[in-house]
Structure formats: structure tokens, C-alpha cells
Regions:
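Glycine-rich cofactor phosphate-binding loops and adjacent beta1-alpha1 units
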Residues: 156-160, 199, 204-279, 319
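NAD(P)H dinucleotide-binding glycine-rich loop of Rossmann-like/cofactor-binding domains
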Residues: 89-167
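Glycine-rich beta-strand-centered segment in the early N-terminal region that forms part
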Residues: 20-34, 47-93, 127, 132-134
């Protein structure tokens, strides 16, 4: 079978390797689609701090089960699935308390261990989640980023009836906003400086879309929600400007959830956060229940994934996909790799 390998930043080869043998607690998955995310792009540019080369990528994935290990009874051949890419120890304090996304030894497929970018992939059945027959493989490959959004939204607890502001209308911000709406938020406003991303947000059914190049964030919140502003602000851009806006304009005593990852040390006014008694939360990846909730939201028509797909590439055009993203950063939301044809 063919397997993708990034040998060095910006260099991809394909090698012929044997189809993996399935161990007793594993399933063999024919990989159908893989999504490329921001972290993959960091690897492509040699800027991911926790990835060494060579590495086989692929952590946003969908596929079809083709073989079962002898102990696997909960799945069947031909079943559509996605794969949870976390590899955790199971013994550290977070793992023992159900928070394996915070494992002290956490590894992620495609970064610190072999990813799914091959025609077939053997994986522990515990890391496989079924997707509905009606869901496309392209959508299935986007359940992973949706799980990121679901987990992030849940950091506020129950968002039903709340007014919510989302900073950043990229793929994760868009999905956070859609998830909040799907979970019953009263009103959701999303902001960005890209009219294209805001138009995509509008297409996905997000209530209020504001370009903060043209309108002050604080003013936009009052217009959207009234003088009480938002109950929670989700920062899905992750820079000093957006986090600074969140802290400056948040209602006193309200909550800010940092969903995005800062590229460096943050320079924000924590004195204001302290003075306003802001509850600043963070979020890290996801757990299994976030996958289940994400799939349910898509299946119920409350989250729309297909509008986020900007372009698809054949498996052997993996490098061209990265080049396309570099050349079209302002207009690209999600690029999908077609590993196999159904």
C-alpha cells in the first residue's frame, strides 16, 4: 500500500509498505479522506515544536473498516468510521480521572507517532468511532476539528439560553459558533477581518457576522446583545489583539474561553481581567463524548460541514495541497485529501 511521509519540512514522498496486520484488539481501516489543519501546516513549514521528521501525517480522518481483530465484536466490516488520534498512557493523574486529553505523555497521530496518511491503517478499536451511513466521508474527516469545537464550547458548561461572541471565523471559530447555536445558545455573534470567512459563517447559519475592521468589537457586542453584552466570549483567533479585545470588552464577571493556541508568549492586560473578575478558561483537544456530540449535531442538521470544504486533492497531490493553502491563505477554510475512492 502507499504511505505518505514528510521527510523534511516541505518535502513529501510516498513509499510502498505492507498492509498492516491486525492485532486482536484492532481494526483495519481503509482510509478514505484526510483533512489538513493548521497544525499540519506548521509541520509542513518546520514550525511545529513537538514533531520530528520523517513523519507520516493525518489525524483528521474517515474510512471504512475492512478487517476485525479476533477480540473485536462492537464493529463490523464495511462500517463507516472516524479515528480519534490521541495516544495516551492511561496511568497518569489526568488519565486516571478521565481527562486523557491532558495525558502527561500525550502523543497525537501524525505528529509524535505515525498518522493515518496511508491507504490502510490498523488502529485499536477503542479509538474508532462510527459515523452514520448518510454522512459523507468528507464530513467524517471533519469530525475531529468539530470535536475540538464541541469540547471548547463545553468549557462554559450549558450554553443554552446564553449570548455568545466568537472571535475568529476560521474553521474552528465557525464550528464553535455553529456548535453553540446547535446547543441552544440564545444568540451568537462571530467576528473576523475577512469578509469571505464571514460570508461563509452566514452561509452556515450564524446569527450575527461582524467585520471588526469596520466596527469596534465592544460596540458590536452592545448592538448584538444590548448593554449586558455576551455571557461568554470564545477566542478562536489566539493573538494579542483578539485576547486583548476579549478582556477589554467582556462584561464584568463574565467568561472568556481561549480556544486557539497562541504562537508565542501572550501580552495581555491581566490587571483588567483581575479587576473585572473575568473567568478565563482554556481548552485542549477533546474526548470521546465530544466526538459523539459532534456527530449527533451534524446528523441532526445543526452543524454544517460541507460549506467549509474549500478544495480536495488526490492522495499523491498531498504536496500540491499544501502549496495551494500557502497560495490561498485568505480564501481557504478546509482542504481535504482523497486517499481512496469509494
Amino acid at each position: 500500500m502507499l504511505q505518505q511521509v514528510m521527510t523534511n519540512p516541505g518535502e513529501i514522498i510516498f513509499r510502498e509498505v505492507p498492509v498492516p496486520e491486525v492485532k486482536e484488539n484492532q481494526v483495519l481501516v481503509k482510509i478514505m479522506n484526510i483533512g489538513i489543519c493548521g497544525s499540519d501546516i506548521h509541520v509542513y513549514h518546520g514550525k511545529h515544536p513537538f514533531t520530528k521528521y520523517p513523519v507520516t501525517q493525518g489525524h483528521e480522518v474517515s474510512g471504512e473498516i475492512t478487517e476485525l481483530g479476533k477480540n473485536v465484536t462492537e464493529f463490523h466490516v464495511g462500517q463507516k468510521v472516524t479515528i480519534e488520534p490521541q495516544v495516551y498512557c492511561g496511568h497518569c493523574y489526568p488519565c486516571r480521572h478521565g481527562k486523557y486529553n491532558l495525558c502527561e505523555e500525550l502523543k497525537v497521530m501524525g505528529f509524535q507517532t505515525t498518522g493515518t496518511a496511508s491507504e490502510y491503517f490498523a488502529v485499536d478499536a477503542s479509538k474508532v468511532t462510527p459515523i452514520p451511513k448518510e454522512m459523507s466521508y468528507e464530513e467524517g474527516a471533519m469530525i475531529e476539528p468539530l470535536a475540538v469545537a464541541v469540547h471548547g464550547v463545553k468549557q462554559m458548561g450549558d450554553v443554552a439560553g446564553l449570548n455568545i461572541a466568537v472571535l475568529g471565523a476560521g474553521p474552528i471559530g465557525n464550528l464553535v459558533a455553529q456548535t453553540a447555536i446547535g446547543m441552544g445558545a440564545a444568540k451568537v455573534m462571530i467576528t473576523d477581518i475577512s469578509d469571505l470567512r464571514l460570508a461563509k459563517a452566514k452561509e452556515c447559519g450564524i446569527d450575527v457576522c461582524v467585520n471588526t475592521k469596520n466596527k469596534d468589537f465592544g460596540e458590536a457586542m452592545i448592538e448584538a446583545f444590548g448593554p449586558d453584552k455576551a455571557d461568554v466570549i470564545y477566542d478562536c483567533a489566539g493573538n494579542n489583539i483578539t485576547m486583548g479585545q476579549a478582556i477589554k470588552y467582556a462584561r464584568k464577571g463574565s467568561t472568556i474561553v481561549l480556544v486557539a493556541v497562541f504562537a508565542g508568549m501572550a501580552e495581555v492586560d491581566l490587571a483588567v481581567a483581575n479587576d473585572h473578575e473575568l473567568d478565563i478558561k482554556s481548552t485542549m483537544m477533546y474526548r470521546h463524548d465530544d466526538y459523539i456530540d459532534g456527530i449527533r449535531l451534524v446528523n441532526e442538521g445543526k452543524v454544517h460541514l460541507k460549506p467549509l470544504i474549500s478544495k480536495t486533492f488526490a492522495f499523491k497531490d498531498y504536496l500540491k495541497a499544501y502549496q495551494y493553502i500557502d497560495d490561498n491563505r485568505e480564501t481557504t477554510m478546509k482542504v481535504i485529501i482523497n486517499v481512496s475512492e469509494k
